[in-house]
Design a protein with these regions (language model features):
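Nucleotide-activated donor-binding/catalytic signature segment of Leloir-type glycosyltransferases, i.e.
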Residues: 255-276
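A conserved catalytic-core segment of Leloir-type glycosyltransferases
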Residues: 41-102
Length: 400
């Protein structure tokens, strides 16, 4: 079987980028040939797939930065809503050329295309006689809601998809309604974490301080600024704590972040090179925090659990559903009630102070548990392993 994978972004650094490469990596266990179409820039040299058809942004194919499904990306990006007709035309032309090349040269039996948006619609038109599966990452639903005119103009062919894979059951009705797609052809596939990268430490070092970790976008919609405020309150009560913030700090955000961090000596900010590096970092931390206002799934919280960390997260429906009763009712994860959310991912300003207090209180609970017993019980680690990519890939393979 010959499988072509398609993504309009970098195959790293975002949830969908990591999902994309994890699917490819997982399918290597089966007797398949694989090729990929994705966005890149001149600084990258990817070697994760046998055959690749790259679209180079800020380079030979397209002059402007990669267009991101989220308005805030962990790398330099263009917003769909800000694209001119000329930009859209050059973007479509570059991807169309690669799609046609892949069709003629690689001749796939199946195409897996990520995000229910413009590129997937093009895939449906170009691969009319090939089985095509679309993967919904939820940011595509958000784009469709925020840019309905763009959706109506450029996203017309998703009805041709053989199946749509959803990351949680909670978005199935939304997919069916927004894209007018038959609900019986939508499969709740969920996600999985890469157990080869995210696994617990063999033994835990004894540290004086409890180490708290955040990794992701430095963005309002992630509750990022409220997290810093919460930690500043926490460290006034407990001096034996540290917070590490992993991500890309953009120049325009630096003054605000530095102002909030203030004179704290217990907050470190840096970036991870890749997923392997992130996995190594996680194994030396104690608690992972995900204070986000919007997530399709929040896979990074699952990766943290797989790495043996306790987790504090907001009440993300997809995550709660995904982890299941046994993990949710254990003491290794605690959920924090969000402030009222409007416009998909914005928190009501007046409710943020109470949310910050809730973050502090929940972190205090987890810190106490960590000090009492750092290691996660074996039976819970085994339960978490049920959500690994190994299990998920078997399900995806059966759908091809």
């Amino acid at each position: 079987m010959r499988i072509l994978h398609v993504l309009a972004q970098l195959p790293i650094k975002t949830g969908s980028g990591v999902y994309f490469t994890n699917v490819i990596d997982g399918l290597k266990e089966f007797n398949v040939e694989q090729a990929a179409i994705y966005a890149t820039t001149p600084e990258y040299n990817f070697n994760f797939v046998d055959e690749k058809f790259e679209v180079e942004f800020q380079g030979k194919d397209i002059s402007f930065p990669i267009v991101g499904m989220s308005d805030i990306m962990p790398y330099d990006n263009t917003l769909y809503k800000n694209m001119t007709d000329e930009m859209i035309e050059s973007w479509q032309k570059a991807f169309r050329e690669k799609l046609i090349q892949a069709r003629e040269i690689f001749k796939p039996d199946v195409v897996i295309t990520h995000h229910l948006w413009i590129l997937s619609s093009m895939v449906c038109d170009i691969f009319e006689n090939v089985k095509v599966l679309g993967v919904c990452h939820n940011t595509d639903i958000r784009q469709a809601e925020k840019n309905p005119a763009m959706k109506d103009k450029y996203v017309k062919s998703l009805g041709k998809l053989d199946k749509i894979l959803a990351l949680s059951s909670g978005v199935i009705d939304g997919i069916a309604n927004i894209y007018n797609y038959p609900v019986e052809k939508i499969v709740n596939i969920g996600a999985g974490y890469n157990e080869k990268i995210f696994y617990p430490a063999e033994r835990y070092e004894k540290y004086d301080n409890v180490k708290i970790l955040y990794a992701g976008k430095f963005d309002e919609s992630k509750g990022f600024y409220e997290l810093i405020k919460a930690f500043r309150l926490l460290e006034k009560k407990d001096t034996k704590v540290e917070l590490e913030l992993i991500g890309n700090l953009k120049d325009e955000d630096r003054p605000r972040v530095e102002s909030l961090v203030g004179d704290s000596k217990r907050i470190r900010i840096y970036n991870a090179v890749d997923q392997v590096h992130l996995g190594e970092i996680m194994r030396h931390k104690d608690i992972f925090i995900l204070p986000s206002y919007f997530e399709g799934l929040g896979l990074i919280a699952v990766e943290a659990l797989g790495s043996g960390l306790r987790v504090v997260a907001t009440e993300i429906e997809g995550l709660i559903e995904f982890l299941g009763e046994k993990i949710n009712n254990s003491e290794i994860i605690e959920y924090v009630k969000m402030p009222t959310i409007y416009d998909t991912d914005k928190a009501v300003e007046e409710e943020k102070p109470a949310f910050i207090e809730r973050l502090v209180e929940t972190l205090e609970v987890m810190i106490e548990r960590t000090r009492k017993e750092r290691a996660i019980p074996t039976y819970l680690l085994e339960e978490i392993e049920q959500h690994s990519w190994k299990k998920k890939i078997e399900t995806i393979y059966k759908l091809l």
